[in-house]
């Protein structure tokens, strides 16, 4: 699938399928003057289609017809009243799915002129590419139906750089989707390390992988406490992108990397969704996806991508409820629930990131069911002691169409994590569980410019939503890239 930005007007384009994006104002009591010209050329087909289909130009609403001549199909897609970048993305996705159903080989898409044509071009590329993504790796008879092979963005000549950047971001999202969607017998800690090695070789990134013995030397008792039950070796991954010039800032991104979570001795029971615990490395997947995108884009920012990767299993070597672990900053943790393991692995990863001398740290993790209860499946939670960093991430997420909601770091709640035998317990009371989880992580970060994203809900969708097919969404990659580039 190739994208090309051209100056051609819709009335002069020829090919399989032409899509026009229309606002509600453009089809008011009378068509806009621009649409009237097209309607005259097409012998009234446009007005007839709008009237007969009762098309109202609601966001992502579509209607189609044949118009004959040099164009086989016409798609009208609604943009709503005052379209945002996310609206353009969703409208483009709706067009892509229609064009695929028509088996169109060539597609042109024309949206109304804007004072930010680069944003529109990027939104079209992201919306179409992400909507048409298919993961057929594990099918014995893969579905070979694909979308158009050639897509032209009309009226957007000169936006080649925006198209290229959007394709680079999409490549990162697709990597994250593939990692999250694959089962735990395919994506293991070793697989994640191999993926990091491939990225390093492909993109010229620096790579450090700490094996268990090196992690032990560094005092990573919290991470290794989780890892010791698994027969698969843990991998502590540290990828670094360094620009050729002096970086304008240095950042660290830390992703939770549990390739499977059984719950340990606090095992997940029937109805717990244990079969979906392959997704518990969604934070690490987004981290590697962001590494791919950043490595392709090559901004003037130094970025460290970190993940402590392991499984949480059950064996004679496994940690017991009540065990006390010592993290690499010397803090001791009473494990009162082995199924709250992600925060243990993150503890040592955050201590590591904190020692890199970066300007800001962001971690993201499929950390708590409590966050899903609070915010639902589509919104990630955001905690940060830094108002500036929180606002940067909120704006980055808004531009990406990835929803974030800031929640409080309510310090008095930390009392619920106090242990009579260690510095902290790894879980507190049921109430405010996502907040106490964030407060737990805060004990392992001295840096004041830190944020925690709980992405437990949006990394996976059971049904198709806009440009996200059912399954892994790749959530977080586009927000992280926007943040790095901001």
From Swiss-Prot:
Signal peptide: none annotated. It catalyses: Release of an N-terminal amino acid, Xaa-|-Yaa-, in which Xaa is preferably Leu, but may be other amino acids including Pro although not Arg or Lys, and Yaa may be Pro. Amino acid amides and methyl esters are also readily hydrolyzed, but rates on arylamides are exceedingly low; Release of an N-terminal amino acid, preferentially leucine, but not glutamic or aspartic acids. Presumably involved in the processing and regular turnover of intracellular proteins. Catalyzes the removal of unsubstituted N-terminal amino acids from various peptides. It comes from Synechococcus elongatus (strain ATCC 33912 / PCC 7942 / FACHB-805) (Anacystis nidulans R2). The keyword Protease applies. GO terms for molecular function: manganese ion binding; metalloaminopeptidase activity. NCBIfam families: PRK00913.2-3 (NF002076). Its EC number is 3.4.11.1, 3.4.11.10. Binds 2 manganese ions per subunit. The lineage of its organism: Bacteria, Bacillati, Cyanobacteriota, Cyanophyceae, Synechococcales. Its cofactor is Mn(2+). This is Probable cytosol aminopeptidase.
